[in-house]
C-alpha cells in the first residue's frame, strides 16, 4: 500500500482554463444572495404548465411491477455538527425581513459538537447538499428528522418555521425512510418500498407533483406509478430518481440542459422575457452519448443507472458497467469533458471507460465532481475556488493515494473525507467552521488537513451542506463513547 500522505489536493491540473475564458457567466455567481438570486432576476420564470399537457405520468401495470424492500443503511452512530448554523443567513448578505426575528440565532461552530437533543438517538444516515441550508437524519428505525432553513417548507413539518435542532417529520411517521436528498429549497424522501415523497419549493416543478406552486409544506408523493425507485438526488432546483431497473428520470428546472432531455427549456415569452418550460413530473432520460475525438456523436446503448449525484446545475450518473456520464452546466470543467460546453444529454466521461478504470462511487460539489475508481484512486474535476484555475477533466488526487476512502462530501467550496481512521478536510476562505479545525485554529486551508478535533473518532459517514458539516461518529466501544462525551454539546437557542 502506498505511503499515506496529506498534502496539496487542491485539484489543479489537467487542461487548465482560467475564469472568464469566453464562457458565458454562470447564473449561480450572479448574485451575492445565491439562494434567492432567481427570485431577484426576471430571467428565470417557469413557463405555462399547459406546455406539458402531452406528458403522462410513468405507469407500469401492477402485475409487472417489482416488489422490493429497501433496507435502512447498516451504519449507526451519533450525529456531530460543525460550521455555520445561522440557517437564514447562509449564502446571503443579510437575513430576509420575514425572518428578522431569527437574525441572531445560530453561530459558527468551529469544531465538532454533539446535539444535546439527540443523545439517545442512533443515526444511520445523514443528508444535506452543496446548495442546502437544511439537513436530514434517518434513524436506525427508518424515521426522518429535519432541521435548518424552512422558507419554503423544505423541512416537511407543515409550516415555514425555521428549526434549530432535528425534529421528527410526523407526516412520514408511518413510513420507513431509507434515503433522502436536499436541494436548495426542496427535499426528496425515499421509502423502503420505493415510493418517493417530496416537499418544499415547487416553483419550477422540482417536486414532481404535476404542478407549479410556490411551496408544498407537507410530504406528498410524486406523480409516478412506474417501477419502484431505489435512488434519489437533488440539484439546486431539479431532481433525479432511479428505478429498480436502472432507468433514470428527472424533473424540475431544465436550465443548462441539466435534466438530460436534450433541451435547456428556454423560450421567449411576452416582453422578450426568457422563461423555462419546466418538467412537472418524472420524465425518463432516454439518450446517453459519447463524443469521439473528431466530434462524432455516438449513442451509448445498454446504460443501466446504479447511482446518481447532483451539483447545483450538473449531474453525474454511474452505470452497471462502472461508466460515468455527466451533463448540465459545463462551466469550470465540472463535466470532465475538457471543454466548458453545456451538455444537454448524458455524455460519457472517457477516463472511466477502460478495463480496470471504472468508477465505484460518484460525488458532486456545487461546481465540481469526484469519482472513486475501482482501484481505489480518487479523481477530481471542476473547481472548488473560482479564483483558481479549473481542472477540465478527471485528474487523480495523488496526495490522497493510499487512503481507503469510504465517504466524501462537498459544500459550496469545502470538501470533507472519511478515510481509514481519519477525517480530512480542506477549503478556501471564506469558511464558517465546516472544516472542523477547532477554535483558535486556522479557519481555512487550500491543502488537505486531518481534522485533529476528531482524532480517535471513527467517521462512518460525512456530509456537507452549503457551509456546514455533519458526521456520523461510531460509538460501538466504550473507548469511542468516552471520546464522544468529551466533545462539546450543542444546545441551540430557540425562539
UniProtKB/Swiss-Prot annotation:
One of its GO terms (biological process) is positive regulation of attachment of spindle microtubules to kinetochore. InterPro entries: RCC1/BLIP-II (IPR009091), RCC2 (IPR028641), Reg_chr_condens (IPR000408). It comes from the Eukaryota. Disruption phenotype: Morpholino knockdown in single-cell embryos does not lead to gross anatomical defects, but causes subtle defects in the migration of neural crest cells, so that cells populate also the pharyngeal pouch, instead of being restricted to pharyngeal arches. SUPFAM superfamilies: RCC1/BLIP-II (SSF50985). It is a peripheral membrane protein. Keywords: Cell cycle, Cell division, Cell membrane, Centromere, Chromosome, Cytoplasm, Cytoskeleton, Membrane, Mitosis, Nucleus, Repeat. One of its GO terms (cellular component) is plasma membrane. GO terms for molecular function: small GTPase binding. It holds the Pfam family WD40_RLD. This is Protein RCC2 homolog.
Amino acid at each position: 500500500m502506498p505511503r499515506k500522505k496529506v498534502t496539496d489536493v487542491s485539484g489543479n491540473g489537467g487542461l487548465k482554463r482560467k475564469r472568464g475564458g469566453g464562457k458565458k457567466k454562470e447564473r449561480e455567481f450572479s448574485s451575492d444572495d445565491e439562494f434567492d438570486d432567481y427570485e431577484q432576476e426576471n430571467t428565470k420564470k417557469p413557463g405555462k404548465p399547459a406546455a406539458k399537457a402531452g406528458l403522462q405520468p410513468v405507469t407500469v401495470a401492477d402485475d409487472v411491477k417489482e416488489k422490493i424492500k429497501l433496507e435502512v443503511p447498516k451504519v449507526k452512530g451519533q450525529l456531530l455538527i460543525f460550521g455555520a448554523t445561522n440557517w437564514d443567513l447562509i449564502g446571503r448578505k443579510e437575513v430576509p425581513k420575514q425572518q428578522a426575528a431569527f437574525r441572531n440565532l445560530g453561530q459558527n461552530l468551529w469544531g465538532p459538537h454533539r446535539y444535546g437533543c439527540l443523545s439517545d438517538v442512533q443515526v444511520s444516515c445523514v443528508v444535506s447538499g452543496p446548495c442546502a441550508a437544511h439537513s436530514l437524519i434517518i434513524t436506525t428505525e427508518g424515521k426522518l428528522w429535519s432541521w435548518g432553513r424552512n422558507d419554503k417548507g423544505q423541512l416537511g413539518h407543515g409550516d415555514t418555521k425555521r428549526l434549530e435542532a432535528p425534529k421528527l417529520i410526523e407526516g412520514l411517521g408511518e413510513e420507513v425512510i431509507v434515503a433522502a436528498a436536499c436541494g436548495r429549497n426542496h427535499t426528496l424522501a425515499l421509502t423502503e418500498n420505493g415510493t418517493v415523497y417530496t416537499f418544499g419549493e415547487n416553483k419550477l416543478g422540482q417536486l414532481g407533483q404535476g404542478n407549479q406552486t410556490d411551496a408544498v409544506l407537507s410530504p406528498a408523493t410524486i406523480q409516478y406509478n412506474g417501477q419502484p425507485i431505489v435512488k434519489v438526488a437533488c440539484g439546486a432546483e431539479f431532481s433525479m430518481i432511479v428505478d429498480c431497473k436502472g432507468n433514470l428520470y428527472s424533473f424540475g428546472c431544465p436550465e443548462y440542459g441539466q435534466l438530460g432531455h436534450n433541451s435547456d427549456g428556454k423560450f421567449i415569452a411576452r416582453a422578450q422575457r426568457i422563461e423555462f418550460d419546466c418538467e412537472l413530473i418524472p420524465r425518463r432520460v432516454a439518450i446517453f452519448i459519447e463524443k469521439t475525438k473528431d466530434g462524432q456523436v455516438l449513442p451509448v446503448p445498454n446504460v443501466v443507472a446504479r447511482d446518481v449525484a447532483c451539483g447545483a446545475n450538473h449531474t453525474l450518473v454511474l452505470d452497471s458497467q462502472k461508466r460515468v456520464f455527466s451533463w448540465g452546466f459545463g462551466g469550470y470543467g465540472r463535466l470532465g469533458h475538457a471543454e466548458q460546453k453545456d451538455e444537454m444529454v448524458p455524455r460519457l466521461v472517457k477516463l472511466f471507460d477502460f478495463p480496470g478504470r471504472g468508477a465505484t462511487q460518484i460525488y458532486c460539489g456545487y461546481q465540481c465532481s469526484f469519482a472513486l475508481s475501482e482501484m481505489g484512486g480518487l479523481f477530481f474535476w471542476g473547481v472548488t475556488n473560482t479564483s483558481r484555475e479549473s481542472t477540465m477533466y478527471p485528474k487523480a488526487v495523488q496526495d490522497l493515494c493510499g487512503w481507503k476512502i469510504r465517504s466524501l462530501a462537498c459544500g459550496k467550496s469545502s470538501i470533507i473525507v472519511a478515510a481509514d481512521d481519519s477525517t480530512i478536510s480542506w477549503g478556501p476562505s471564506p469558511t464558517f467552521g465546516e472544516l472542523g479545525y477547532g477554535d483558535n485554529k486556522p479557519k481555512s486551508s487550500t491543502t488537505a488537513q486531518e481534522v485533529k478535533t476528531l482524532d480517535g473518532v471513527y467517521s462512518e459517514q460525512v456530509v456537507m451542506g452549503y457551509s456546514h458539516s455533519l458526521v456520523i461518529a461510531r460509538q460501538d466501544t466504550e473507548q469511542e463513547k468516552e471520546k464522544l462525551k468529551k466533545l462539546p454539546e450543542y444546545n441551540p437557542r430557540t425562539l
